[in-house]
Swiss-Prot record:
Biased composition (Basic residues): 324-333
Signal sequence, start to end: none
Major localization class: nucleus
Name of the molecule in the record: Ribosome biogenesis regulatory protein homolog
């Protein structure tokens, strides 16, 4: 395959931004866009590299590099540029004294094993923490004390001191980076403000924070006088499929005992709702029975009245006959 020429000519000058390695081809596409697209991309890339190699060059360890000029196009960013952090206390001191950070070797020669080992970390060389013997210095105040424990305590103090310095540096940086602006205490989607939460909400928040550990709060130490964690839910435990008969009998007896000991709970609202229609029905039936009873009595009275009237008529007719007969007898006499 023959080498292609590095000379590229364009009818319309392209826009080249070497700072962003941006190449904009302004020539219009004629005909089918898919045809000759690879050739066009090759020429544009070649022209971009031709402009790059026209910059100032220098050699660094068998490699030729160039320094790109400032960008002409300002590319949009999702977030603003990070601000320069406040130097730490040690960085300020090192700058004043002219102390430069020296790069330490990753490996060190271990005199005990005569091998090269990592300077730090696991199986590091010249590890004094694994010494089985510590030489007592001549100026020791108490030669009988535990020098191994003293070395461990000193290491703990150094770690605590470094951690304290780190926290101070973070606090110093926060004072410089935090800007005054609108209050961010009430943010959308965050929930209720901490000052406006109720006692129960705060308690639940504390319990959730305690459970948000690798051990689900099992090894979380509590404060003095702090209440126990609120159990918002219990894990359901199932009984074994095969269990002895004695245990089943005891469980059945316990259930029966609980049922006997429990008193029936009467809900007044439900009882009134159930008893209301029954009471109305009973009163209605009583009123109807009273009406029937009154009506029955009146009927009996009416029947008795008619019967007495009929009997009275019969008695009256018989008496008049007797009186007439008596009168006739008296006249004859």
């Amino acid at each position: 395959m023959a080498d292609k020429s590095t000379e590229v000519e364009k009818a319309i000058d392209p826009i080249i931004d070497l700072g962003n390695l941006l190449f904009i081809d302004r020539e219009p596409i004629q005909g089918d866009a898919s045809e000759g697209l690879e050739e066009r991309a090759r020429k544009n890339t070649q022209l971009l590299f031709n402009n790059i190699w026209q910059l100032e060059q220098k050699r660094v360890e068998e490699a030729i590099i160039v320094t790109l000029p400032p960008a002409t196009y300002r590319l949009p960013r999702e977030k603003r540029l990070p601000e320069k952090k406040e130097p730490t206390k040690w960085e300020k001191y090192a700058a004043e004294k002219g102390i430069e950070k020296r790069k330490k070797d990753k490996k060190v020669f271990d005199e005990a094993t005569k091998e090269w080992k990592p300077t730090y970390g696991y199986r590091r060389g010249n590890d004094d923490t694994k010494d089985w013997l510590i030489e007592i210095p001549d100026n020791a105040e108490d030669p009988n004390k535990d020098f191994f424990a003293e070395r461990r305590e000193k290491k703990k103090e150094r770690v605590a001191k470094n951690d304290m310095q780190r926290m101070k540096n973070l606090a110093r940086q926060m004072k410089t980076t935090v800007k005054s602006g609108p209050s961010t205490e009430k943010m959308i989607g965050v929930g209720v403000d901490a000052k406006e939460k109720s006692k129960q909400q705060v308690r639940f928040a504390v319990d959730r924070a305690k459970l948000a550990t690798a051990s689900a709060g099992k090894f979380q130490e509590g404060l003095k006088g702090e209440k126990a964690n609120v159990k918002t839910g219990k894990k359901r435990k199932f009984e074994a499929n095969e269990a002895p008969v004695s245990g089943e009998k005891e469980r059945a007896l316990q259930i029966l005992q609980r049922m006997k000991s429990k008193k029936a709970k009467i809900v007044e609202e439900k009882a009134a709702a159930v008893a209301g229609p029954l009471r109305e029905k009973k009163e209605k039936s009583e009123r109807k029975g009273a009406k029937d009873q009154t009506r029955q009595k009146s009927q009996i009275h009416r029947q008795q009245w008619f019967k007495n009237k009929v009997d009275g008529k019969k008695k009256g007719t018989g008496g008049a006959g007797k009186k007439g007969a008596n009168k006739a007898k008296a006249r004859k006499g």
